[in-house]
Amino acid sequence: MQERKYNPKDIESKWQQFWTEHKSFEPFDIDIATSDSMKKKYILSMFPYPSGAIHMGHVRNYCIGDALARNYRQNGYNVLHPMGWDAFGMPAENAAIKHKTHPKTWTYSNIDTMRKELATLGLSFSKEREFATSDAIYTRFEQEFFIKMWERGLIYRKEAYLNWCPKDKTILANEQVIEGKCWRCDTPVVQKQMFQYYIKITDYADELLECLNKLEGHWPSQVLSMQRNWIGKSKGLSFTFDFSVDSLQKLGNGKVKLEVFTTRPDTIYGVTYCAVAPEHPIVQQLIENKSLDESVIKSIEAIKNTTARARAMSEKVGFDLGVYVIHPLTQEKLPVWVANFVLMDYGSGAVMSVPMHDERDFEFAKTYALPFKCVLTKEIDGEEPTQEICAAYEEGFLINSGEFSGMSSSQAKERIIAHFENASIGKGITNYRLRDWGVSRQRYWGAPIPMVHCQSCGIVPEKIENLPITLPEDVVIDGEGNPLDKHLVWKDCLCPKCGKKAQRESDTMDTFIQSSWYFLRYSTPRKLWEKQAFDKESLTYWLNVDEYIGGIEHAILHLLYARFWTKVLRDLGYIEIDEPFANLLTQGMVLKDGAKMSKSKGNIVNPNELIAHYGADTARLFVLFAAPPTRELEWNDKAVEGAHRFLKRLWERAEHIESCTQKPHINHKTLQKNEQYARQKVYEALQKSNEIFSKKQSGYAFNTLIAASMEAFNALNEQENPLVWTEGYFVLLHILEPIVPHICWELSEQYFRRCNFAPLSVDKDALTKESVIYAITINGKKRAEVEMPLGLSKEEIIIQAKESVPKWLEGVEILKEIIVPNKLVNLVVK
């Protein structure tokens, strides 16, 4: 008998080479799959940015997806499980400056490195469909989409105050500003007025919101809630305040009014002041008309240079503008303030302030000693609260509100909106928190925006036949501004419309555009990539993505944009689906010492070192066993060693297997008890595997599947029947192949010619129990365990229970006898 020494390095390199040479994981052509009536599964883990090295978060993400893909292949599905690279972005330019290299060179070198590192994990990717988003052919179709959206009116260009990163020298979307800092480099963000291109994601706000209902039960509720809140649909009243006569003189404009939007028209009688954003036009009018002190102007400019999120986090700051508006119902004069909590890009950039019933307004009014007025009570005919601020910011019943007093908030909202509409001084409208998506970036390493600036024609899209507009490679990247803006040879071009001299747009696209449609591109075979963005037949066959795996941090960035882009491409006629991802799994972070792994904390675990020391199967087993996929995973060196020991034992004990090409037939009733128990545990593990993969129990709780397999293996070790051993391995290698593929392929090849990597059914006879273990407790404390035959009467169960604990029943009175069928007997005594 050959020596059973487990050598993962040799086994894993052998099978990785085999899978590559035989293209083992390429999906079948759809005509073959369709003719064979094969069901499809599209399994996709979010693709990585090629930073240069994989980390444990990558390992966990891709092992989860790989386990799903391998299981579905075993069960006869045609599986698409692709991989690619989210390759554009600022880090490549930063590296170019630091290492004196070209961003393209740095990026593609990193891709080569990470591709090799991921290959050592034995991931079953479709290598034929791999691409990087920086590939020219990918950019070509992305630019085509941009042009089609421009022609459809879904893209426009305007000047606005934008989030500007002084270090990276680029615009950031609101979502890319984290606590007032750049999401990439952590530099404090300032506001800068610039032209940029916007995509009208707001045109799809209602559909994006409504379609979330279709995803209930298929996406995590937290992600759905985050997207609903980000879209932020609210209904309310839009109306205008007239300025007082003396204020109009200060403004230098006799016709200006102050437009506001409120979701709480029921509190309109509680307005004691109005607040405007520092960018509001009336502020500029007051400055131009020299109606503000220089010190106030400087303070307002300082607020302008603060990001929206930083304003929200900071203390409430404002300045009295010295002008007044007239309350449309009470005719009271109300002061107008500029305030840091009012944003120009939400609503009209002005708000009515009700300090008694709004926490933010209250804080501001308290700071600047502005008046309060209570117009709501909790109960009908309730007394006006004596405390400084009403306990309810919520709805209630109106007081001090003229003809609307006594009404509930909901009734008053409708009546007040109707009153304003009948008087033609306002109207009920729907508003959204969602803003149009600013997609211009002042950087080199991105997809060029395919627009041309012509003095005669204005802004003109490039001709489709001239695409792709590629990046020049002879650029100087020194960290100062946009290298494309300085490359005059590249910028100079002819106008696609009139043929005169013109200049290319030097801004590049936000990299979230690239990740908004990559999952659609995978559906098309490589041989068709040059001809079209998508092959419709292939796309119809593969989409939706059946399982999409990635971090919850992408909930309101990538996932919202991907849903939006899918709907746009549908409306442009490229695709026919409404939603891209049928199911979403958000995996938890990998922690060490209770914190997320990072270089700054010094708690990094290098996957390459882990694989070199223990093997890929050990790494895979650990990350899938240590915690359910959706939970955080705490690194544990001892657990890694334990995973390796299990695989070593699995390898060594294979000496008991007899070669065969089909599962042995065993008469369960003729076996000894320990043999029956081993078979029972083996088929319980198979049943658990089937349930986890088919019913997605607990978000694919692989840890319970692995635990059941280990329990079955231990039970096999307690018996010596070679047929039971052989059947046990036949089934266990089938169960574990998605988790630890290398060792399973090697053992299966040696003993079963890989015939066990096909659908297996549970032997119900093996699961039939003739007896059950009862825990016997006295006053809730476990005192014994008793094996009892199934089918006993309650009286018989109690008799056996009492016989098992005689010393605990001496000198006591039994007050109550409780039976939990097939589990427990509790005797309550005194």
From Swiss-Prot:
GO terms for biological process: leucyl-tRNA aminoacylation. Its EC number is 6.1.1.4. GO terms for cellular component: cytosol. It is an enzyme of class 6 (ligase). It holds the Pfam family tRNA-synt_1g. Its main location: cytoplasm. SUPFAM superfamilies: Anticodon-binding domain of a subclass of class I aminoacyl-tRNA synthetases (SSF47323), Nucleotidylyl transferase (SSF52374), ValRS/IleRS/LeuRS editing domain (SSF50677). It is found in: Cytoplasm. GO terms for molecular function: aminoacyl-tRNA deacylase activity; ATP binding; leucine-tRNA ligase activity. InterPro entries: aa-tRNA-synth_I_CS, Leu-tRNA-ligase, Leu_tRNA-synth_edit, Methionyl/Leucyl_tRNA_Synth, Rossmann-like_a/b/a_fold, tRNAsynth_Ia_anticodon-bd, Val/Leu/Ile-tRNA-synth_edit. It catalyses: tRNA(Leu) + L-leucine + ATP = L-leucyl-tRNA(Leu) + AMP + diphosphate. It comes from the Bacteria. Keywords: Aminoacyl-tRNA synthetase, ATP-binding, Cytoplasm, Ligase, Nucleotide-binding, Protein biosynthesis. A motif ('HIGH' region) lies at residues 48-58. ATP binds at residue 599. A motif ('KMSKS' region) lies at residues 596-600. Belongs to the class-I aminoacyl-tRNA synthetase family. HAMAP family: Leu_tRNA_synth_B. This is Leucine--tRNA ligase. It comes from Helicobacter hepaticus (strain ATCC 51449 / 3B1). The gene is leuS.
